[in-house]
Amino acid sequence: MDREERPDVDSIYMQAVQALGQQGGWPLNVFLTPGGLPVYGGTYFPPERRHNLPSFLDVLQFLIKTWKNEQEKVTKQTKAIVDYIRQSSTREKRNTDLDDLSFDGEEKTQKLFENHYDKLNHGFQFQSNNKFPPSMGLSLLLRHHHRTGNANSLIITENTLKAMKFGGIYDQIGGGLSRYSTDYKWLVPHFEKMLYDNALFTTALIETYQVNRKEEFAGFANDLLQYIDRDMTSKDGAFFSAEDADSEGVEGKFYVWSKEEIEKILGRKTASVAIPFYNVTQKGNFEGKNILHIKRNSETVAKEIGMNHGDFLKELQSAREK
């Protein structure tokens, strides 16, 4: 079952697995009674035993034996789990009178994001170095700014969006946002691209433009929409849910470049523009190759190499097209 198509069903069985004392996550494998009640579950079960994990066949054999010999006990346990989920899902009816609505939750969440804001690299620093596109969080900050006039909420949003646009998490040539950055600088992505990330991020960009009317955010949103239309839309109008991180069995191979490859493909003149703009070096920044990223704007780089800015932009566009 596609959990993105039925998140409600996914949520129920995820709660069941956690109630059984197992670690939640995906892929989620849950074994059910004929009536659909959860008996046992977990995430990944390998084809053969390894790292103290039972194989998928081991789990099947165990469950067949248990169901055959202890069906009454299993049924009792499954009903207890269902009762637990039902109770935990029950919420007191709330008065929906608008006068009773509170923005306490928004205020607390805004303060949480503010406290975890990475002032140097932007985005939010929590327990690990990984940084995920915080699209919904940025939308909340925009709403907080709109309601209260809090300038910091807007500044945090703008800085985070720009840091991701210029970082390695964004495919500087083909477009599209990777699933997350494995470092706090937004440089080294997990190269998989998810449809929902790009759609939600586009929404955050459009909402930012609605607030500040700065064309760079509308332009970035348009770039992402073009990427979705070109690479994540099938000929019959359906959407692909993701682009794989691997190319020819190697993670990220399609997205990283050596200096020699760039010079060979682009030619001397165009390469002389692309190499400094995308911070390409002989040594590289990822396993001997380069994840393209931007540290300085085009005007600055054009001035450094002594080129007219208009000519510089033409060569840069030529580099992207090649």
Task: List each language-model region with its residue ranges.
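Replace the tail clause
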Residues: 1-322
